[in-house]
Amino acid sequence: MSTLVIVRFLVADMSAAKKTLADNAALLEEIGTEAKKSGARHHRFAEGIGELVAIDEWDSVEAFQNFFDDNPKIATVTKKAGAQMPPSLEFLAGVEAAGTF
């Protein structure tokens, strides 16, 4: 069973944070490639009120934490984006059910 991970980064300037993501596309692609090798299944960003949210699916909580904790590339992007650290983390167990897609 997979683990869903919600990572909430507080940001003061959402426009600047989104521009940072666009300006650092190559680095984000590198991070994504490494994440897949470490157990990530899906990843996307979303915008909330005053927060940039990463919504991920991982093989396990441990796989996510081993990848995320002290990752210098993630630290670089979050710092450039003006995100407050540490982010809020939420872990949810996936539930297999008919109609899931």
Label the predicted regions:
Residues 1-71, 80-101:
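Short S/T/G/P-rich N-terminal loop/turn motif that feeds into the first structured element of a domain
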